[in-house]
Amino acid sequence: MRVAVLGAGVVGTTSAWYLAQTGHDVVVIDRQPVAGNETSFANGGQISVSHAEPWANPHVLPAVLRWLGREDAPLLWRWRADPAQLAWGLRFLGECLPGRTRRNIRAIVALALYSRARLQALRGETGIAYDHLERGILHIYTDRAAYVHAAAAARTMREFGLDREPVSAARCVEIEPALAAVRDRLAGGDYTPSDESGDAHRFTRALADLAVARGVDFRYGTRIEKLVRGGGRHVAGVLIDGPGGQELLTADAYVIALGSYSPLLLRPLGIRLPVYPAKGYSATIPLGPDSQAPTVSLTDDERRLVISRL
């Protein structure tokens, strides 16, 4: 079967790899000159099953209200007259009920455990290198109430098979000595030793190279204009505009891996994805050979901040 994968980020490239592994003829379309050059380019670098509590939970609503009007808020909402944002916001509120949060944690943990296992298998099969470290992820808290809430969330995750354990402030420093300078400010933490970290951009580029060797056709520098409707919701093809000009690309199946752009592409077909974009900021800092920077990946849940050493 011929499959067109739209988007060459970490999700699209990984999808293309496994499709090729199962015998499909795969073409990948992306507007960038290389794979992994947008959302997958610079992120927190965590393989974090422990980050399984959804943003939509009963405790986030008071926090959002406290953060309203603060430009330095860890989670900043910019409301505007956008029906898509309003619809997404209402669905978000509906998922903040305790029962739904528990159900969603169960689903996220199951998916994340499977995803991490597949990543480990892929690493063993291919020897792919992406600066990965297997030193776990440590969530840290300076607020006692936030620590107590996190301990309850960790308990729920343990019920579903994740090794996330509450730890004292002293234990946080034992796990990551770079925290010694802020030990007196720590209320405690949660540590998941099975979690990992790594460079998503390097992983995606390396896997794209492996996929090309398996016959996957990557068409870079090619814009995706629209999906062309056939009968009903059937897709007759995708209109692309690349170095050779416009072309109607046809396939037996299409994988949409365009992140927050996916709803825009699918909306003309009457398919409405409940996806709304979130923006984060990333800084990459070079380290010297004697740097005392953390070696364990850290998550500051209160400030929505992560640190990973590559």
Model-derived features: where do they sit?
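A conserved short coil-to-beta-strand element within the FAD-binding core of flavoproteins
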Residues: 167-176, 196, 217-236
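Glycine-rich Rossmann-fold phosphate-binding loop(s) that bind the pyrophosphate
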Residues: 7-9, 31, 36, 258
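Active-site substrate-recognition segment that forms the wall
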Residues: 43-51, 55-95, 180, 224-235, ...
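Glycine-rich FAD pyrophosphate-binding loop
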Residues: 21-41
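Residues forming the Rossmann-fold NAD(P)(H) cofactor-binding site
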Residues: 13, 205, 263
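N-terminal Rossmann-like FAD-binding beta1-loop-alpha1 element of flavoenzymes
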Residues: 2-28
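Conserved SAM/SAH-binding loop
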Residues: 10, 221-225, 243
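Rossmann-like flavin
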Residues: 86-210
